């Protein structure tokens, strides 16, 4: 998602001045009749103030905690979100959808030993890792460097039946995070192809943090795969490079199973004049379970709940219906938003826009418009009232990796909030993803930006039509969307027709 690194500091006074200046200037010219300028000022001003949003984030992170889909804490998060919406006077329901498979870690441990040495570094199973046999799995530990093709060629047949230890760079930013994902595809394919017993990644995070990355092949994976704390992995690597043979015994106990039912939480403020037209504001409720899930994605869940709360409190009535969608199953493949698209298929022609906010707590500096150039001026127009919180740059490339995906594949105009990296990269899916990673002022400013965007799309006269499958296919041919989908193991579902807008039926002429 490649957020930029523009620095941004301000005081509360400067924030207020910037907002007022923006509204008196450009926004005044763009305001439509009927008090829209006043309404957006009321909304953004409220969101910048002392609302319950930050306390909601603390409650979700500290009291509910990590929220892996299928877990008891995830079920509690659904009840938590419903209670927050209803307490704000916002109608809300939980909507069921089908998760294709259950995967939860129950416990993970490892012991490394060789002549005269034995130690037990901490490990975390990677999502979609297989479990080890009862009692654990012991195998030689083999140093394969960075896991490049040349590294596997160097060690040759030694890979077969061994745990391969993969060296990583220490991760400092989002660019490094996406490099990890890209490199893992080749590393894991080479390891499995050579007959490795399993894959052990040296932890890349500062401070010996453990974290979870999905195995690159997802549920098709056939090997135990894990992350080992950085210091322990470096020690093992030094011993191996000193010529000391090592064996590792890993014990990964998992809770796995077939398809099951999970739930999204959908709050709604019904449109006053065009209720059949819908603006979807989405943030995923689930998180991985090592940390509390503040950056990914509790902060943006709290933000959307507060946006709904302030709209209701102020009595603002949008022309279009606004749905506040707290998705589940995002971390395992965006299954909650896919389920919504399937269950609301008959309504999608009326969906004006679907937004995903999912890149942490850094400042929103624009939006991905995902291959829909006509969206750019509409986003620019909606953001005029909060121009003082910018600058904002819209990026018109399709992005895969969050809950805009199934809307994009179904032809609905869709956006992703682009955000500065801030503390996102090193704490992504990590034990350190806790409440302290988020800055309250930035979170409030982001809420104002999303509030202005939402109000703009819910009230403006313009609306982009839904695209057909042929137009989505044209986007795939013109961009790297196909490659992105393949890297996330999503392409087969598109080809099979289980995701995306179905092809238009060809009507045969009636014989005369």
Tell what function each PLM region has.
Residues 29-36, 42, 58, 62-163, ...:
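Noncatalytic luminal/extracellular "stalk/propeptide" segments of secretory-pathway proteins
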Residues 309, 313, 425-488, 497-499, ...:
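His/Asp/Glu-rich mid-to-C-terminal helical/loop segments that flank catalytic regions of hydrolases
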Residues 11-22:
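Bacterial N-terminal signal peptides
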Residues 48, 274, 289, 327-427, ...:
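Metal-dependent peptidase/peptidase-like ectodomains
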Residues 36-71, 97, 209-215, 286-287, ...:
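N-terminal capping segment at the start of a domain
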Residues 37-39, 123-156, 215-294, 306-309, ...:
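Soluble metallo-hydrolase cores and metallopeptidase-like ectodomains found primarily
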Residues 40-48, 62-72, 139-144, 171-188, ...:
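Second-shell loop/turn segments in exported
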Residues 183-184, 188-191, 265, 281, ...:
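Alpha-helical metal-binding/catalytic segments enriched in His/Glu/Asp
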